[in-house]
Swiss-Prot record:
A single GO cellular-component term on record: cytosolic large ribosomal subunit
Protein name, entry field: Large ribosomal subunit protein bL25
Family membership noted in the UniProt record: Belongs to the bacterial ribosomal protein bL25 family. CTC subfamily.
Keywords recorded for this protein, A-Z: Ribonucleoprotein, Ribosomal protein, RNA-binding, rRNA-binding
Function (record text): This is one of the proteins that binds to the 5S RNA in the ribosome where it forms part of the central protuberance.
Subunit structure: Part of the 50S ribosomal subunit; part of the 5S rRNA/L5/L18/L25 subcomplex. Contacts the 5S rRNA. Binds to the 5S rRNA independently of L5 and L18.
Molecular function via GO: 5S rRNA binding; structural constituent of ribosome
Source species: Oleidesulfovibrio alaskensis (strain ATCC BAA-1058 / DSM 17464 / G20) (Desulfovibrio alaskensis)
Translocase recorded as keyword: no
Length: 193
């Protein structure tokens, strides 16, 4: 990791709905920092700074959290958005120990056009993420799946994913993506109409 990002936050005293509304009015996002020792620290975060960090880091990049001068490595664990306005309403930050593996949800990116879809098949994507057991500093941001060589009836399972050393798939072996024959359509050849 060449240069780690930093997010500055302040501890917050007021808890509850009223205090959180006041924070949001001041363009701040209420949140909780769960540190690696098990402490929960309520924090207030500048909304614009959080949005910029989330665009870059997402949920799979470790960054430094600066809480009034104390720094800790962490991940965005969960984030809540307003239902129809473009801002965050709450964030959970998870402090990590860089030497201990964690379970993380890594997004999957399907690339290419399957050969089977060019002759009428349908691409069915069953899952757009996979749970991986890995150290926080080497966590992949996304896992690419190239489907260019998939024929009709082919499928990609979790066991088919190729990961770097040190990463372990946490999930059982299920189908991620499949190219299947189109539904309905004409009957089989030789069938009377």
């Amino acid at each position: 990791m060449s240069q780690q990002m930093t997010l500055s936050v302040q501890k917050r005293e007021g808890l509850g709905k009223g205090a959180n509304r006041k924070l949001r009015t001041a363009k701040k996002v209420p949140g909780i920092f769960y540190n690696s020792e098990g402490k929960n620290i309520p924090v207030a975060i500048d909304g614009t700074q959080l949005e910029k960090l989330y665009e870059t880091a997402g949920k799979t990049t470790v960054f430094n959290l600066d809480i009034e001068g104390e720094t800790a490595p962490c991940l965005i664990w969960q984030i809540e958005r307003h239902p129809y306005k473009p801002f965050f309403t709450h964030v959970d930050l998870f402090g990590v120990d860089m030497e201990k593996p964690i379970k993380a949800r890594i997004p999957l990116k399907i690339t290419g056009v399957a050969k089977g879809t060019k002759i009428g098949g349908r691409m069915e994507v069953y899952r757009d993420f996979v749970d991986v057991f890995t150290k926080p500093g080497s966590m992949p941001k996304v896992i690419d799946i190239n489907v260019s060589n998939m024929e009709m009836g082919d499928a990609v399972h979790v066991a088919d994913l190729k990961l770097e050393d040190g990463h372990c798939i946490y999930d059982s072996n299920y189908v991620i993506v499949r190219v299947s024959a189109p539904r309905g359509g004409k009957g089989e050849e030789g069938e009377d109409a």
